[in-house]
Structures are given as structure tokens and as C-alpha cells.
């Protein structure tokens, strides 16, 4: 899996509400979270399927 999958999720610092997904390295699963619209890192996906394909072993 790519190294960015190990990053903690980042909600960002703006005021938007975008439903997103991140990979949780401890449970080896993807979870939903609310992204603010800016200040992201690479461990953010638009769909749970994209997260699973990229990060779940």
C-alpha cells in the first residue's frame, strides 16, 4: 500500500462539509469523515471503494 495511507486523516481548516473517506491503519479499514474543503493530505478519498482499492491489503 502507498505510504500516504499511513497518514492520520486531516479534516482541513475551512468551513465546508464534504463527505470523504480515509484509511485507518490500525483496523485496516476505511472510514468516513467530514472534510472542510481545504488543507488536505493524501489519505482522503471521494468514495469508500477508492479507499479500499488503494489502501486495504
Swiss-Prot record:
It comes from the Eukaryota. One of its GO terms (molecular function) is serine-type endopeptidase inhibitor activity. Keywords: Disulfide bond, Protease inhibitor, Secreted, Serine protease inhibitor. Disulfide bonds join 5-55, 14-38, 30-51. InterPro entries: Kunitz_BPTI, Kunitz_BPTI_sf, Prtase_inh_Kunz-CS, TFPI/VKTCI-like. Belongs to the venom Kunitz-type family. This is Kunitz-type serine protease inhibitor. The lineage of its organism: Eukaryota, Metazoa, Chordata, Craniata, Vertebrata.
